[in-house]
Amino acid sequence: MSGPNTNYDPVQVSALDADQVEARVAEALEAIARASTTAELKQVRITHTGDRSALALANREIGALPPAARKDAGKRIGQARGRVNQALKARQQELAEAELEARLAAETTDVTLPVVTSPQGAPHPITALIDNVCDVFTAMGWEVAEGPEAESEWFNFDALNLGTDHPARALQDTLWLDPVDDGKCMRTATSPVQIHTLLKQQPPVRIISPGKVFRADEYDATHLPVFHQVEGLCVDKGITMGHLKGTVDAFARAMFGAVRTRFRPHYFPFTEPSAEVDLECFVCHGASVGNPDRPCRTCRSEGWIEWGGCGVVNPRVLIACGIDTDVYSGFAFGMGIDRTVMFRNNAPDLRDFVEGDVRFSRSLRGGAR
């Protein structure tokens, strides 16, 4: 900075010359007007108002003037800097508003465009029903048990009182694993899970065992070589056929609502006495029986639909698991999950549930039960 100059001549300090100051202001205003972005305007601010700008240097030269001249020079420089700062502020607001509008325009969503959504997934109807069945029985205090799908001959047949001459052991009914002589097969029911449980757990036992089972069946509208079952087992003191009937009735109501059931005498090697469980036809409600004018394809005009099997556990099964039959008794039941889903949704063909046709799955998604 220059020292005080008592013989001050304004011409000698060019930075303080009025024309020079006006020229610097004009340059700054022109640069401000040319700035098209806030980033460019920031650079203009540094160039024309920063510490090394012409106006800043002129402001520092005021100290070199005699006291009498400092007031006019300070006023002139202050007014010049004020004009530049005011122009910077106005231009900053203009550019900021313009940039905001541009960003909003770029980010605007056209609400008239169709919504692009991802395909909605949902549990398979069979999986959903298995979960539903498990919820029903766990709410009653039962447990869910699982076991291997490939079983030994003893677990799948012998322990369940199916003798060596039972037709279920034949190649045309059971899927035996190579080598056949090893006595390994794909389980034909989930009953082996009950044997595994009884060998590991002493009564009282209350379990259900849902899962896949395998049969050498034809693949048609009512049969599948791989399908799903849920079996239940209750072993405790004083268990009777009455307990079985009450449990199966409660299960039927949970699945189908206020439906009538019928217990029809039958034979199963692992239960004695045994029964088939029938449900009153959901379509004709028995009105087609003996009425040729109103035939029902669902129940074949019989008024009832077969649902599953049940019975009091054969003492031989309990003895094979080391359970004292003088103290304990039990009941068992088994129903097809696939058939239950079929009944609940009035589906005519079991194959629709396993062929992976998305159109069929979507048709059930809204009203599948």
UniProtKB/Swiss-Prot annotation:
Sequence positions that bind Mg(2+): 272
UniProt keyword terms in alphabetical order: Aminoacyl-tRNA synthetase, ATP-binding, Cytoplasm, Ligase, Magnesium, Metal-binding, Nucleotide-binding, Protein biosynthesis
Enzyme class: ligase
EC code(s) of this entry: 6.1.1.20
Domain of life where this protein originates: Bacteria
Biological processes per GO annotation: phenylalanyl-tRNA aminoacylation
SUPFAM superfamilies per record: Class II aaRS and biotin synthetases (SSF55681), tRNA-binding arm (SSF46589)
Any one GO CC term of the record: cytoplasm
HAMAP family (alphabetical): Phe_tRNA_synth_alpha1
Family (UniProt): Belongs to the class-II aminoacyl-tRNA synthetase family. Phe-tRNA synthetase alpha subunit type 1 subfamily.
Record protein name field: Phenylalanine--tRNA ligase alpha subunit
Protein species of origin: Cutibacterium acnes (strain DSM 16379 / KPA171202) (Propionibacterium acnes)
